[in-house]
């Protein structure tokens, strides 16, 4: 399976970027290319750890499509960042024995960008579009007949001499990935034959992912060390692999021993200010501010953002979700409140 990547981008209405965080599930610049992951990505469904129900559904769909000699139905994968949507698209292409052409919606700014991709597709190839919810209206309208009728409608000429020309396309599979399925237009969403959500990973699967990645990186970790990384990675394989690389760095410089144990993992991740539950400095700053200056809340988002020197959209989209997921923070009509669990984690007494 070959990967063909298109990475040109454009500005778009996204939440402002937060400062670089080792526990941020969004890809760092060095992780942006699918081909640059130290070979940690699985290549086949049998190597893909976790997401059991998703794998079962897709394995049946792939086998059926290959039996018919036809392209796989179009697939929409959605869920939080870092759970393996891009990896799954590449795995599907590998299972089908075809190329995976990789791009993202911001790279498809002009009509000719999407037209160029579509006309160069070979039969049954996979076209992967990341952040598909950010497609322009023009790009979406070009995709409608391509997905449904395997046809590209092109307008030739201008004004009164303009004519529409239909160009036949080979059978292909569009795999779209998004963290915001609700932001897709209904006409686009309805053209996907398979719509599947990726879930956060459990501790057992994450430990298996760390063990596999350690083997590929030629690192020796104890079972307890793998478990320690798995506990701190926020249920996200991308973060697990990133934390493993940071542990590798510390081990190669300070470790001395060839076997990495839980104590060394704790030392390395404490250096990066990632605690036993996966909270980093940004998470703790928010909770500490609420507790120390406001008695645990409630406090409005704008007030918190001003006190922390952060953009409100960044706090809401980047920092708060994991705290809400852990049950350390609540959003109420009057503002943000630290929960009893959040107080206990930071060593504060619970309210009477």
UniProtKB/Swiss-Prot annotation:
The record's subcellular locations are:
Cytoplasm
Task: Please name the GO terms that the record assigns under molecular function.
Answer: ATP binding; ATP hydrolysis activity; four-way junction DNA binding; four-way junction helicase activity
Tell me which GO cellular component terms the UniProt record holds: cytoplasm; Holliday junction resolvase complex
- Source organism: Prochlorococcus marinus (strain MIT 9313)
Which family would the database say this protein is a member of? Belongs to the RuvB family.
What is the designated name of this protein? Holliday junction branch migration complex subunit RuvB
Tell me the gene name: ruvB
What is the enzyme's main class? hydrolase
Q: Where is the composition biased (Basic and acidic residues)?
A: 33-42
Q: How does it assemble?
A: Homohexamer. Forms an RuvA(8)-RuvB(12)-Holliday junction (HJ) complex. HJ DNA is sandwiched between 2 RuvA tetramers; dsDNA enters through RuvA and exits via RuvB. An RuvB hexamer assembles on each DNA strand where it exits the tetramer. Each RuvB hexamer is contacted by two RuvA subunits (via domain III) on 2 adjacent RuvB subunits; this complex drives branch migration. In the full resolvosome a probable DNA-RuvA(4)-RuvB(12)-RuvC(2) complex forms which resolves the HJ.
> Where does this protein hold ATP?
40-41, 82, 85-87, 191, 201, 238
Q: Which UniProt keywords apply?
A: ATP-binding, Cytoplasm, DNA damage, DNA recombination, DNA repair, DNA-binding, Hydrolase, Nucleotide-binding
Q: Which GO terms describe its biological process?
A: DNA recombination; DNA repair
| Chain spans, region Large ATPase domain (RuvB-L) | 13-201
Gene3D superfamilies the record matches: 1.10.8.60, P-loop containing nucleotide triphosphate hydrolases, Winged helix-like DNA-binding domain superfamily/Winged helix DNA-binding domain
Region Head domain (RuvB-H), residue ranges: 276-352
